[in-house]
Amino acid sequence: MYAIIDIETTGGNASRERITEIAIYVHDGSQVIKEYSTLINPECKMPPFVARLTGITDEMLVHAPKFFEVARDIVEITEGCTFVAHNAAFDYSFVKQEFLNL
């Protein structure tokens, strides 16, 4: 099983920045069997450059769940799966840091 993950963030440093969106597709080797996607309130302002780049604005995030509110869903969906991402080191560092912040 593979958890194909894509995130958007407030910047490029996992120790200082936060996830603003996560999408997860669980693939069994033949097809996608689960999908999960949500905006995440980073509890900080979205830098204007990042908002222009991603299209994600403070207004979109204000009522989004905080990471601790979706953490259990993320664990349940990805448990037992191999983490796959386009830029895996970047995405994994942010997901790992968000869990460390809990």
Where are these regions (language model features)?
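Conserved non-catalytic scaffold segment of RNase H-like nuclease domains
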Residues: 1-102
